[in-house]
A protein has these predicted regions:
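Zn2+-dependent metallopeptidase catalytic core
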Residues: 2-22
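Subset of outer-membrane beta-barrel
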Residues: 26-30
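Short, exposed beta-strand/loop patches in secreted or surface proteins that constitute
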Residues: 37-42
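Short pre-active-site segment immediately N-terminal to the catalytic Zn-binding motif
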Residues: 47-63
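Post-HEXXH active-site segment of zinc metalloproteases
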Residues: 57-58, 73-100, 104
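Catalytic glutamate of the conserved HExxH
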Residues: 62, 66-74
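Substrate-binding/catalytic groove segments of enzymes
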Residues: 71-82, 111-120
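Long, well-structured alpha-helical subdomains associated
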Residues: 92-95, 106-142
Length: 142
């Protein structure tokens, strides 16, 4: 399987867990994403994936994270107070409930699919704890 097929298959499997329709997947140049460090983005037209990134755990984590955002949108999670990464500093951004939830869900997926447990070492302990608590809640729900 090539990268496109692998990503589509993974997105379908994760979407089935979330009980959402698998969004379209497009590979795009990095300039079409919000930042140069972004790997994957959820748009109204589907998921955009950087075309210059290889098949890595980070790619799968990012796809699962964005699919959780798609789930949040479909299930009317409040976006009223949500701010994008260019509107807040990185710690404030990651502490938002929707980001905590998406990170926790992606961590559960990584553990279930690949036996990998993301540590979030680039985040403060307070945010890691929020993710850990939410991760345990999600594990009970699945």
């Amino acid at each position: 399987m090539d990268k496109r097929q692998i990503c589509i298959k993974f997105a379908r499997e994760v979407s089935a867990i979330l009980k959402i329709a698998a969004p379209a997947i497009r590979f795009v140049p990095v300039k079409q994403l919000r930042t140069s460090t972004q790997i994957v983005a959820l748009t109204p037209d589907g998921i955009l994936i950087r075309n210059d990134i290889g098949v890595t755990p980070e790619l799968f984590f990012a796809i699962a994270h964005e699919l959780r955002h798609a789930y949040q949108l479909e299930n009317d999670r409040s976006l009223h107070d949500y701010r994008t990464s260019d509107q807040l500093d990185i710690d404030e951004y990651n502490a938002q409930p929707l980001e905590v939830d998406a990170n926790a869900f992606a961590a559960v997926v990584m553990a279930e699919f690949f036996g990998i447990s993301p540590q979030f070492l680039n985040m403060p302990e307070s945010i890691r704890q929020l993710i850990c608590v939410r991760k345990r809640q999600i594990q009970k729900e699945l």
